[in-house]
Amino acid sequence: GLGDVYKRQVECGIIAIADIAMNSENGETVTVYSVAERRGLSGKYLEQVLTSLRQARLIKGIKGSRGGYILNKKPEKITLKEIIDALDPSVLGSDVAVVNDENTEFAQVLDDYIWLRLENKLNSYTESITLRQLVDFYNKESAENVSEPMYYI
């Protein structure tokens, strides 16, 4: 559905900025091509996502022969909320549509009691996670997966 498109965009953006964080730690730039190769993502799609992240000033584009992208600030200063908001502001926003006009009183209760609280929880949760934590978690998980032997029958 339509939600999948948004989810894919957000997911792609999180993966891309995490990849840039992991591969630009020594100041070297990360190209769209290298991210696409490493993560199995479409270069064209990645360009759009990186444009959103650049416009939000989370990453910086460097021009020239050694051009590419770098983080605009330290990964511990970038929150998951900032990343998601840059990619799709509606994900953590209150875009709750009232479907049934005759039932607005109950819809109002849902808005106040459920959706608003859920939105606040999502916002504070994503605000509490930094890009650094995300990268560290990924590195820990992938290291654990590598250390487990695989048996093929």
Q: Where is each model-derived feature located?
A:
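Minor-groove-contacting beta-hairpin "wing" of winged helix-turn-helix DNA-binding domains
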Residues: 65-72
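N-terminal helix-turn-helix DNA-binding core of bacterial DNA-binding proteins
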Residues: 8-11, 18-41
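Conserved segment of winged-helix/HTH DNA-binding domains
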Residues: 75-99, 120
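Glycine-centered, phosphate/nucleic-acid-interacting loop/turn motifs that mediate DNA/RNA or nucleotide
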Residues: 57
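Short, hydrophobic-biased segments on the C-terminal half of alpha helices
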Residues: 50-51
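C-terminal regulatory/oligomerization modules of transcriptional regulators
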Residues: 99-153
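Short, small-residue-biased leader/transition segments that mark boundaries at the very start
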Residues: 1-5
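Key DNA-contact positions within bacterial/archaeal DNA-binding proteins
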Residues: 44
